[in-house]
């Protein structure tokens, strides 16, 4: 992480303290997504999907980042079966259909994308379901996948959602062309 770019530094630059945060959502537990957990410990709730937690704790040895969160793990939630996403499972964060944590297995078994709705528009935060918009245009799944078939299914869903005229923005965690921005919709 470049100087000034850690989550703690970015929040401080905006005058936001960890205790001001109601939620911190961990899409998955890869080191690059969980390394800043100590900088947001004051948040009211830190959340990760139970399925992601299970696979990272008990099965997948690639998760060398466990030491960052095992002493005080994030709170876990269960996906619910519904009609949303490639796996037809999501977690309705507020119970009002405004924010769904959509199960997009493939890169990891329990990863989610955040689907944020406002009226008839939405923003999709894809985590590592796609590297950039080029990924869904070319059909290129992430380089590291637990399950390439499920990753392709997730990528196809991301592409479909991203091309929808109701999509205000579709953002990927590792897109080199992404820039800090405010999205109003």
Predicted feature locations:
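Metallo-beta-lactamase
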Residues: 1-32, 50-103, 148-167
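Cap/insert and terminal regions of metallo-dependent hydrolase folds
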Residues: 1-9, 111-185
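Catalytic core of the metallo-beta-lactamase
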Residues: 19, 35, 39-42, 77-133
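Active-site flanking residues adjacent to catalytic metal/cofactor-binding acidic residues
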Residues: 27, 48-49, 106, 125-128, ...
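Catalytic metal-binding/acid-base residues of hydrolase active sites
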Residues: 30, 52, 105, 109, ...
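A short helix->loop->beta-strand "cap" motif at the edges of active sites that frequently abuts
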Residues: 42-45, 166-168
């Amino acid at each position: 992480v470049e100087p000034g770019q850690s989550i703690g530094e970015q929040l401080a630059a905006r005058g936001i303290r960890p205790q001001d945060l109601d939620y911190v959502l961990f899409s998955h537990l890869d080191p690059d997504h969980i390394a800043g957990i100590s900088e947001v410990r004051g948040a009211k709730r830190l959340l990760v999907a139970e399925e992601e937690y299970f696979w990272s704790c008990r099965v997948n040895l690639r998760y060398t980042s466990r030491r960052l969160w095992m002493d005080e793990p994030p709170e876990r939630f269960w996906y619910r079966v519904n009609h949303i996403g490639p796996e037809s499972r999501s977690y309705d964060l507020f119970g009002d259909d405004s924010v769904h944590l959509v199960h997009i297995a493939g890169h990891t078994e329990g990863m989610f994308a955040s689907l944020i709705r406002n009226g008839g528009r939405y923003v999709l935060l894809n985590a590592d379901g796609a590297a950039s918009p080029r990924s869904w245009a070319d059909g290129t799944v992430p380089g590291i996948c637990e399950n390439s078939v499920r990753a392709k299914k997730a990528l196809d869903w991301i592409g479909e959602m991203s091309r929808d005229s109701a999509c205000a923005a579709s953002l990927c965690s590792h897109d080199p062309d992404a820039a800090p921005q405010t999205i109003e919709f």
